Amino acid sequence: MRTNLIILVSGLLSLGIYFFVPAEENTLKGLAILTFIAILWFTEALPLAVTALLVPILVVTAGVMDVKSALSHFANPVIFLFLGGFALAATLHKHNIDEYIAGYIMNAAGKKPIYAILGLFGATSLLSMWISNTATTAIMLPVALGLISKLKTESPATDAFILLGVAYSANIAGVGTLIGSPPNAITAADLNLDFRDWLFVGLPLAAILIPAMVGVLYFVLRPKLPKVEVSQIAEIKGLVDRRSGYRVGLIFAVVVFLWIFSGPISSWIGIDKEFDSLVAVLGIVLLVYFRTIEWKEISRFTDWGVLLLFGGGLALSAMLSETGASQFLADIVKNHLSGHGVFVLVLGSVLLAILITEFASNTASAAIMVPIFLALGQDTGQFPPEALALAVGIASSMGFMLPVGTPPNALIYGTGLVEQRTMIKAGLVLNIVVGIVITVVAYFFF
């Protein structure tokens, strides 16, 4: 009943826009399709992946694209790049290497509570750069709960500090690499960025935001850290078979090396910037060939819905550009923000992206907003359009205030140890701080 009602309302709104908004016909088609898809994505009336599959159907039916063009976005090279990321993550998880890395970092951090907690955040951040934010949080949550038990905190503020730190570390560090979070891939595809390009932007930004996040949580929550020393936090002896670990580690190192140095290597062998995706496919072949994992295991671990969401998002992005709908919406935003200066324009755009992400899928938010703000940047001429779109794409991963904002938030809230009002209080401050940091970095360095 709810699904039918939402589809009916979104359909009527889309028709209302098409018939009553003063604009060119192609632009009206783009706006109507965007409205229909955006409402379904934001409300999740249908599964996100299913709504993504509606995009090519609608754009072809409306006469905006032909079938081949519409469906070609579901074979975009960035989708194969992310598929390779899923394969690497599946292999690390199968051989317990992810748990080993997390445990090793935490044990090495030291026995003082603050060092152990910072080690927990650091391990979460490192894993989240290579594994999905959700999977990372699922891995680290039992470790965090074990640490809380060892510390005998008996303080809700301290528990919230530890648990929210894990969720927020996963969210933030996901922007560190191109495969760390789905919005990265959407943004990179729109801006033609490869793995190395993204690394030079995402990694420094994550390195700034993680300490800022810890500082905000400490300031807002005022945790009472016990002064007792902690015994060994994680048992890692025998966790990984040495022979398998070496094989997986070598393949992982080769793939990451090729990604980082993709520019000179691809030029040397005469392949364009999509070389990163070819490396990801090679990684899958090597992992299966050397029997570190079976294809069925990769298939089970892969979130195929996310890959379909990429295709729908990229098709929607292309449609917005071709119909002029993104330019139409950019003009509206410009009229409200451009008169207040470039900094306010960037800050307003970033905070809007963060706000939308609190209520909608971060991937869907990026798919909708990046092309609009790319057009806005081109229209204003006051700020590099790629920089504005990049800032908005990164901000799409930064919902900290609500349990529904990101899956890591929901997992932490599900423990029952963090009240929603605590998450809102800490998340609101962090949203503002992160928005300002992203804006400053984008303004001066992007």
Predicted features by range, described:
Residues 56, 102, 134-148, 163-164, ...:
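Re-entrant/interfacial helical elements at transmembrane boundaries that shape
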Residues 151-223, 234-235, 408-441:
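Membrane-core helix-loop-helix motifs of multi-pass transport proteins
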Residues 36, 49-50, 54-153, 301-306, ...:
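Membrane-embedded alpha-helical segments and adjacent helix-loop junctions characteristic
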Residues 91-97, 139-144, 215-226, 403-405:
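Membrane-water interface of transmembrane alpha-helices
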Residues 80, 84-85, 89, 119, ...:
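Alpha-helical transmembrane segments of multi-pass inner-membrane proteins
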Residues 153, 199-204, 312-316, 326, ...:
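C-terminal transmembrane helix pair
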Residues 39-46, 123-132, 167-178, 260, ...:
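Transmembrane alpha-helix interface/packing and boundary motifs in multi-pass membrane proteins
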Residues 1-81, 197, 201-331, 429-431, ...:
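Hydrophobic transmembrane alpha-helices of multi-pass small-molecule transporters
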